[in-house]
UniProtKB/Swiss-Prot annotation:
Name of the protein in question: Large ribosomal subunit protein bL36
GO terms (BP aspect): translation
Cited SUPFAM superfamilies: Ribosomal protein L36
Source taxon at top rank: Bacteria
Lineage of origin: Bacteria, Pseudomonadati, Pseudomonadota, Alphaproteobacteria, Hyphomicrobiales
């Protein structure tokens, strides 16, 4: 999982990326291509 300051550019890298908020953190999840997982931090 990548940890980035800004997820906006990462979200555009794959069309199945979803932006979700869990426990006060922002994540990108991708069920079809899990290598795009990322967390903002």
């Amino acid at each position: 999982m990548k940890i980035k300051n800004s997820l906006k550019a990462l979200k555009a890298r794959h069309r199945d990326n979803q932006l979700v908020r869990r426990k006060g953190r922002v994540y990108i999840i991708n069920k079809t291509a899990p290598r795009y997982k990322a967390r903002q931090g």
